[in-house]
Amino acid sequence: MEYKKLLQALQIDINQKGCHSGGEWHGEGKKIASYSPVDGSLLGTVQGATIEDYERLLDKAEDAFESFRIIPAPKRGELVRQLGNKLREKKFQLGQLVSLEMGKSLQEGLGEVQEMIDICDFAVGLSRQLHGVTMTSERPSHRLYEQYHPLGVVGVISAFNFPVAVWSWNVALAWICGNVCIWKPSEKTPLCGIACQQIISEVLKENKISEGVSCLLNGDSEVGKWLADDQRIALVSATGSTRMGKDVAKRVGARLGKSLLELGGNNAIIITPNADLDTALMAAVFGAVGTCGQRCTSTRRLIVHKDIFETFKDVLKKAYAQLRIGNPLDEKNHMGPLIDEDAVTMYNKARKQVDSQGGSWLVPGGVLDKGSYGSNCYVKPAIAIIDHDAPIVHQETFAPILYLIQYEGSVEEAIAIQNEVKQGLSSSIMSLNMRETETFLSHWGSDCGIANVNIGTSGAEIGGAFGGEKETGGGRESGSDAWKAYMRRQTNTLNFSKELPLAQGIVFDYKFFNN
């Protein structure tokens, strides 16, 4: 594949300025080198933001908000529709770039762009349904209702594992709701951010929309802190590790600002004796090795009943033996590389912790040779048999390591094991028994934001709200009523009588005012 032609098709320079609000590209900060984990090649460099670049973008965004918020929501929906069409035109090239810069398989890269298209379609319909609620007033000749208004400037901080889709979840809903956006992409995938900004800028220019409605701000974690600390940023939507999310929450909370956090997951599949084992196997393998185990919703734990433990262990081992690892742009391969060598170091550290904490290896894993694979970022997926209370099991291991855990009793025991970790993003049960599945979905069942039956933990549709509980952050993005996080809520009471009755039946004698 000729990388330069791909970058040219997406309007990316090899030496690229990293800040943009719709006019000229700028950026005088630190240079960020983008290396492909596929073969270790240098794809390009992006010059990040200084504080002066940041202020320049923020000024543009604040000015743009004043005019953008008064555009009717269905008209803003038309802009999102056009963005979706641009993404359809660029789907293959953008999907290739995602695979090239991040390392996920081409099928997953294309799927990520399709997710962007889907959220645009969803948001277009939503633009005519930003409805409030009308309530019955206790006072005669009064009307009581709620409505929603735009927030202002929304700051988006995204992670490397979904370098384009998470941005689209935010910008599509934020636009529909009348907000403007400043996006700080991961410094590990800056070129994906450049490509998206070029695409969205075409839509804005063609519609003569003010500069500043969509801004790009490349840089390191220091740049993210600027967004989190700035009281002019009405909402900070941050996706990443729990450690990062705690820092963002602390900074935004210190100014009593709004934050939307989608953080780590330690996702489990419960497999009961009543499971369809073929379905369970497919869900477990894709969940564990898809995106090389670097999805927020990747399957980290399999909680399997003792009666089927040995049988499932055998078929799982056979399935892993058939996985093809290699260049993610080759559609024959199931799994590509980890994002970088730091991720490989964390993978090796986790394997050592498994050894020291009494685990054994069903599939031992290991780092693959650079000479055969093109970079130092390729690893083997691993499966460890380990106790549910081992410390490593309670951490989010952002790598293709699957922890195989046995339970002996009822489904309630399995649910308790699932819920004992600090994270609460995604969960799943494999069972054809209605009592087991309904228990799992009940208020005493899974404590996660996502609870699935007979599908895996990974691969959420955009129609549902996406997010989790506990150390996952509590925020919700994407579908359902997640749009409400991007608006300020207002309660209105209208009096169309000639009197001024007070709520709760309070009597206030004011007749003497007229004397």
Question: How would you name each of these model-derived features?
Answer:
Residues 132-279:
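Rossmann-like NAD(P) dinucleotide-binding subdomain of oxidoreductase/dehydrogenase enzymes
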Residues 41-44, 209, 233, 270, ...:
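Conserved C-terminal structural/oligomerization subdomain of aldehyde/semialdehyde dehydrogenase
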Residues 41-130, 141:
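Glycine-rich loop-to-alpha-helix module at the N-terminal edge of alpha/beta enzyme cores
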Residues 40, 76, 98, 120, ...:
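Residue-level signal for inorganic ion chemistry
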Residues 1-39:
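Hydrophobic face of amphipathic alpha-helices that form TPR/SEL1-like repeat modules
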Residues 42-49, 64-70, 156, 269-272, ...:
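Short, well-ordered beta-strand elements within core beta-sheets of diverse protein domains
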Residues 199-202, 243-388, 412, 416, ...:
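ALDH superfamily catalytic-core signature
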Residues 63-67, 85-92, 103, 125-132, ...:
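Generic secondary-structure signature for well-ordered alpha-helical cores
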